[in-house]
């Protein structure tokens, strides 16, 4: 056990926080849930219609599925369904299941576009775009989201806040 070498996290979260270290998965999972809630508040506070304020569940093939983000953009009237992910590096079976969920939930909602939203990356790296686009799935980052909602902050302020305010709190928690 002494010789086990911890692996560096592949989550974009650490990059967004300006940290380069090993991570505690439970802290990252909780962070992911909280940042999802944050972006739903941003959408609700914008001119776009947040379609999950009352209910974030939809029935798909007899099962209840959680909706991370669903909104009608005030700029283009497009109905978006977004699955929030801070990490796009999951195994091939999970990729297939997650991609399938996006398609099924998008169809159940009658959304125009179903995609991943990575709330800890400004723009999605080309390798990830290619990987997911080749499977017929779009992936968006913060810069894209801020182009669709009239947030009360700009991208630089968001990432500065993550690094300077959120990161020290998570470090104190053990990240």
Annotated model-derived regions:
Residues 84-95:
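Short beta-strand-loop-alpha-helix junction that forms the active-site gateway
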Residues 78-81, 110-121:
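Hydrophobic beta-strand segments of well-ordered beta-sheets in folded domains
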Residues 64-82:
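Active-site beta-strand-loop-beta-strand hairpin of nuclease catalytic cores
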Residues 116-175:
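Domain-level recognition of nuclease-like catalytic cores that cleave nucleotide substrates
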Residues 56, 85-87, 120:
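An acidic- and aromatic-residue-enriched active-site/binding cleft used to recognize and process polar
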Residues 46-59:
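Short, well-structured beta-strand/strand-turn elements
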Residues 1-47:
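Interdomain/boundary linker segments immediately adjacent to catalytic/signaling cores
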Residues 95-103:
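Well-ordered, non-membrane alpha-helical segments in soluble/globular domains
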């Amino acid at each position: 056990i002494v010789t086990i070498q911890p692996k560096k996290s592949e989550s974009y979260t650490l990059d967004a926080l300006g940290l380069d270290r090993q991570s505690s998965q439970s802290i990252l999972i909780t962070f992911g849930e909280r940042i999802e809630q944050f972006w739903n508040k941003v959408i609700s506070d914008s001119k776009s219609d947040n379609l999950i304020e009352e209910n974030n569940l939809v029935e798909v093939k007899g099962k209840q599925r959680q909706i991370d983000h669903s909104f009608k953009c005030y700029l283009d009237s497009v109905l978006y369904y977004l699955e929030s992910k801070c990490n796009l590096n999951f195994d091939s079976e999970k990729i297939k299941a997650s991609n399938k969920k996006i398609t099924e939930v998008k169809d159940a909602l009658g959304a125009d576009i179903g995609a991943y939203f990575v709330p800890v990356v400004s723009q999605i790296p080309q390798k990830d775009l290619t990987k997911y686009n080749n499977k017929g799935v779009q992936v968006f980052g913060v810069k894209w989201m801020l182009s669709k909602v009239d947030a009360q902050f700009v991208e630089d302020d968001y990432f500065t806040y993550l690094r300077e305010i959120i990161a020290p709190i998570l470090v104190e928690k053990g990240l």
